[in-house]
């Protein structure tokens, strides 16, 4: 019987503490200018006047040059004849998406022109995955108009293959998530499409400071594309069972909500029921949102759901969901065969009810082992700024507002939209990147999160060429057991760090690290030292 080939790579990123009593709470420091980020988001016009402009944009975190440091890709709107007012025409040709390479010293360099990824459309979101299994992560940009797929050439440049690939969806796409839905070893993609915007619809019925909402326009169906393995993709939306012509999708994530080893899809829709597509095997899905009580929150009606995020909030071994919205937000706790709305019971409704939430992120910002929550807020219909939210999980079923203690960033208001998480400086704590509508983004360095111990895990497929999207990682340290599914697409219009970060608190090692691979096989490691990046490559069968 042949031996299993297992590759484990330990990378010591930063020295952790020897001992600490009760660590002070971390703060987030605005390093945007110091980091050399000169990007500014634009709605492609001078005045916010419609739902296309108001939807905003996200940000992508990915390591495009395989140097072990996370790079940033920012997307922007641009003047569009079907969207923008005539006086914004002077912006035509002056706006583009921007790619920033991480210089390893806290700064970034704009390499957009050399890379060839400025794009040509009104962009809303971006995602990344190694679509051809060549070891280099590729770039997919979601647009109002044809989407754009850029293949990574491995030399710092990209080649656009949008039309040839079959992924140049002409509809209004907001977000995409990559995963292997059929288990063939190739990454497929689910694309969220929003609505059919018409510049002239109902304009006379709205006050000057407002504009028509999502129900004023027909919805558009999302799309699931199967990777054919030859550089092309096939639309399998209907045959896979994920067709919803009136969803008005705003966000998507992939998680194994029922612990059966298969990737399920959760889609958030605007003013409509959310969709929970249960993977029943054989490349088929069944919509079970209402049946599992995940279609609505406790209000029992569709709200303006934005980007979903997930984590095992209560350490019961089942992944929970949070959905920012225009109401109180919605925390759906996984009760194994259904979900329960615990937004009010956990204290989140009181904290979040006064804001319009867009980019929600579960992250353990203080590395104590429990999932905390950041929410980027901003008015939906005008450029009225709102407070960002940061709440700390107390480990006892409540969330505590800690924004006032978390740095100067939280003392100001913003018209925020997308957001992403990343360990940009490889120091063991998660930083934040927040996109502001028609303004500069904020890059926020986490200072102090690594006072507690931590472990970062990056599961890779056989051969170590690409991230094992869909793998589940379990980390046990002392009495605490944490789980996380490998899906970095878990925030509004954005994609975060592909590495999975686990806070260990005062534990100096993980007693057990388990990777359940997408094919169901498992790799188990014991007594893993803390404060390092652990790259685990799936063994050959």
Q: What do these predicted regions represent?
A:
Residues 21-27, 45-46, 338, 346, ...:
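Gly/Ser/Thr/Pro-enriched helix-cap/hinge segments flanking short amphipathic alpha-helices
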Residues 5-16:
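Bacterial N-terminal signal peptides
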Residues 95-102, 220-227, 278, 388-394:
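Beta-propeller blade signature
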Residues 28-31, 107-116, 157-167, 231-243, ...:
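Blade-edge beta-strand/turn elements of extracellular beta-propeller
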Residues 37-58, 93, 115-127, 166-177, ...:
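Repeat-based blade/solenoid architectures
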């Amino acid at each position: 019987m042949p031996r299993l080939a297992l590759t484990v790579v330990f990378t010591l990123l930063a020295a952790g503490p020897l001992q600490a009593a009760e660590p002070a709470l971390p703060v987030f420091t605005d390093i945007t200018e110091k980091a050399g980020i000169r990007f500014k988001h634009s709605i492609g016009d001078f005045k916010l006047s419609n739902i296309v402009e108001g939807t905003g944009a996200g940000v992508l975190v990915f390591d495009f040059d395989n140097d072990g440091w996370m790079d940033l890709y920012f997307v922007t709107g641009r003047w569009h004849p079907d969207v923008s007012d005539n006086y914004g025409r002077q912006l035509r040709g002056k706006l583009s998406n921007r790619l920033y390479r991480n210089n390893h010293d806290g700064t970034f360099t704009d390499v957009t022109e050399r890379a060839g990824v400025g794009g040509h459309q009104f962009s809303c979101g971006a995602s990344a995955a190694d679509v051809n299994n060549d070891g280099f992560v590729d770039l997919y940009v979601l647009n109002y108009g044809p989407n754009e797929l850029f293949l990574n050439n491995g030399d710092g440049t990209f080649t656009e293959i949008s039309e040839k690939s079959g992924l140049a969806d002409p509809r209004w796409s907001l977000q995409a998530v990559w995963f292997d839905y059929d288990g063939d070893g190739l990454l497929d993609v689910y694309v969220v499409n929003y609505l059919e915007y018409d510049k002239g619809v109902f304009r006379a019925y709205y006050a000057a400071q407002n504009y028509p909402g999502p129900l004023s326009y027909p919805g558009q169906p999302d799309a699931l594309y199967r990777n054919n393995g030859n550089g092309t993709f096939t639309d399998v939306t209907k045959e896979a069972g994920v067709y919803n012509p009136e969803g008005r999708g705003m966000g998507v994530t992939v998680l194994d909500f029922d612990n059966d080893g298969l990737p399920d899809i959760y889609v958030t829709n605007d003013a409509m029921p959310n969709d929970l597509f249960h993977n029943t095997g054989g490349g088929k899905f069944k919509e079970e949102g209402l049946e599992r009580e995940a279609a609505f929150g406790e209000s029992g009606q569709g709200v303006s759901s934005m980007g979903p995020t997930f984590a095992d909030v209560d350490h019961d071994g089942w992944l929970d969901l949070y959905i920012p919205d225009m109401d109180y937000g919605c925390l759906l706790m996984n009760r194994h065969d259904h979900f329960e709305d615990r937004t009010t019971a956990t204290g989140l409704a009181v904290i979040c009810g006064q804001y319009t939430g867009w980019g929600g992120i579960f992250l353990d910002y203080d590395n104590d082992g429990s999932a905390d929550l950041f929410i980027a807020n901003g008015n939906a219909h005008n450029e009225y700024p709102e407070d960002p939210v940061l709440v700390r999980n107390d480990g006892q079923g409540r969330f505590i507002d800690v924004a006032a203690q978390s740095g100067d960033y939280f003392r100001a208001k913003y018209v925020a939209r997308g957001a992403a998480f990343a360990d940009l400086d490889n120091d063991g704590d998660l930083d934040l990147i927040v996109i502001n509508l028609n303004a500069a983004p904020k890059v926020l360095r986490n200072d102090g999160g690594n006072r507690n111990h931590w472990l970062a895990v990056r599961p890779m497929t056989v051969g170590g060429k690409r991230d094992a999207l869909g793998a589940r990682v379990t980390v046990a340290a002392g009495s605490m057991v944490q789980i996380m599914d490998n899906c970095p697409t878990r925030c509004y219009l954005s994609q975060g760090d592909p590495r999975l970060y686990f806070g260990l608190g005062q534990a100096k090692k993980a007693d057990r690290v388990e990777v359940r691979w997408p094919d169901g096989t498992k790799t188990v490691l014991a007594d893993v030292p803390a404060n390092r990046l652990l790259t685990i490559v799936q063994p050959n069968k």
